[in-house]
A protein has these predicted regions:
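A domain-level signal for the structural core that forms small-molecule/cofactor-binding pockets
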Residues: 1-141
Length: 141
């Protein structure tokens, strides 16, 4: 979970997991919740996710994007939490292939975060932008 001080850098969430009970499975995902909409960044984020997913299975990105969009939809606000991402659970097709996918999800998140933060970390922000961020952050809960 990344909640930066700089409102120009979006909040970003990532997790992966391997659940081991009588049945074993992988789950996880990542999503982005910007305070300030940046359509170029949104396109970049989704392109990177799609590229990574397609290395494993061309069906993953549309399936996991849809799952994320539904999972992070806020019905009480009638809006999505952010700009989406991917989300999956109960993934137990082939352990070795699933584990490679999980590792790529983590590596891709680290790469995306590094690129976004590097691009925006020294950008100044206004008081109004900070207020927008605080409002969005309060709605994140």
């Amino acid at each position: 979970m990344l909640h930066p001080k700089n409102p120009k850098i979006p909040a970003m969430h990532f997790n992966t997991r391997f659940i081991c009970t009588k049945k074993n499975w992988f789950g996880g995902g990542m999503d982005v919740t910007p305070s300030l909409i940046d359509n170029k960044e949104k396109k970049y984020f989704h392109n990177e996710l799609k590229k990574m997913c397609n290395l494993h299975n061309k069906k993953y990105y549309p399936k996991y994007k849809k799952w994320c969009d539904e999972y992070f939809y806020l019905p009480h606000r009638e809006e999505p939490r952010g700009i989406g991402g991917i989300f999956f659970d109960y993934k137990m097709d082939d352990w070795s292939k699933d584990f490679l996918f999980i590792k790529d999800v983590g590596s891709t998140f680290a790469y995306i975060v590094k690129e976004i933060v590097k691009k925006k970390m020294f950008k100044k922000w206004t008081k109004k932008e900070k207020e927008i961020k605080l409002l969005k952050r309060g709605r994140y809960v």
